[in-house]
Amino acid sequence: MGEDMRGVKVVSKWPPMIVMVTSQVAMGSVNALVKKALDVGVNHMIIGAYRMAISSFILVPIAYFLERKIIPKITFRLMVDHFISGLLGASLMQFFYLLGLSYTSATVACALVSLMPAITFAFALILRTEKIKDLKTQAGMIKVMGTLICISGALFLTFYKGPHISNSHSHLEALPHNNSDHNTKNWLLGCLYLVIGIVLLSLWILFQGTLSIKYPCKFSSTCLMSIFAAFQCALLSLYKSRDLKHWIIDDGFVIGVIIYAGVIGQAMSTVAATWGINRLGAVFASAIMPVSLISATLFDFLILHTPLYLGSVIGSVGTIIGLYVFLWGKNKETEADITTLSSRMNNEDQRV
């Protein structure tokens, strides 16, 4: 009987695992395709605005049918919180992230996203939600070591571009034709913008943790965030251009990318991530982040014929190693907490 129950538990984990891995594969392809659309010259915040608007359109019926009976009363404070959520996790984040993507590559962007757990951990220390004394434990030291490895990989990826390791003939059209100093400056600037975007996303995770307690309906919450973010992205697009004709996109490829990014990259990925995290936990969600990096690299290299650089490969590997070291420490910390809780309960039972 026990073996049958364990078998059922293992089988029940497969659907969310498959969904989350598929979601990460899709996110890698979204980054690669959006990068190609940005290369055409489209205002990156117009892409962001359309993406968030499409996400809102998709999530409205889902939120209505699944959460209409349990949605809490919408107060002014909750509206302000969702406005801030949209600013941190969508509009302002996309402003820097997509700008950085336009200067670098989908591979670099996905690699730097692997920094997010380490950055969130650093902010948790600064904001005192993570206790300094916990760093003296074995799990704490492993988490710090993982964070440092992550940062080292990101720095290597940023400051060492290296030679391209793809076939020079098949990828000739993707190589930049500007002078090398200008390319290096753009590369460094792009990495800086990406890191700023990921820092904003990390702050959003911390903020969202508080918001989800006050407003536990994830679909309608994401929908509200997307609506606010769509308007915010539209305002931020004025930074680059105030000409309304730029909102009229007649390139079929770019239109397809925007629809794909809105439906798959925003709405469906959010739904998949929410369901998967509820079923398997946030640690597993972080553990499969490198799947998007592999997906973006293969999509970039094999389909879009983007050149692959040695520095990107080495830095990406270092960042992924750091991520898994960090998650190893996080897992040990969780095990220690469970052991401590179990011993306390046993002591209380003995007293009774």
Swiss-Prot record:
S-S bridge residues: none
Flavoprotein found in the keyword field: no
Pfam families for this protein: EamA
Residues annotated as domain EamA: 27-157, 192-335
Gene Ontology terms for molecular function: transmembrane transporter activity
Signal peptide: none
Membrane topology designation: Multi-pass membrane protein
Keyword Membrane: yes
InterPro entries per record: EamA_dom (IPR000620), WAT1-related (IPR030184)
Membrane-spanning intervals of the chain: 14-34, 46-66, 83-103, 107-127, 139-159, 187-207, 219-239, 253-273, 283-303, 308-328
Swiss-Prot/TrEMBL keywords: Membrane, Repeat, Transmembrane, Transmembrane helix
Subcellular location: Membrane
Lineage: superkingdom: Eukaryota
GO cellular component, one term: membrane
Family (UniProt): Belongs to the drug/metabolite transporter (DMT) superfamily. Plant drug/metabolite exporter (P-DME) (TC 2.A.7.4) family.
Record-given protein name: WAT1-related protein At1g11450
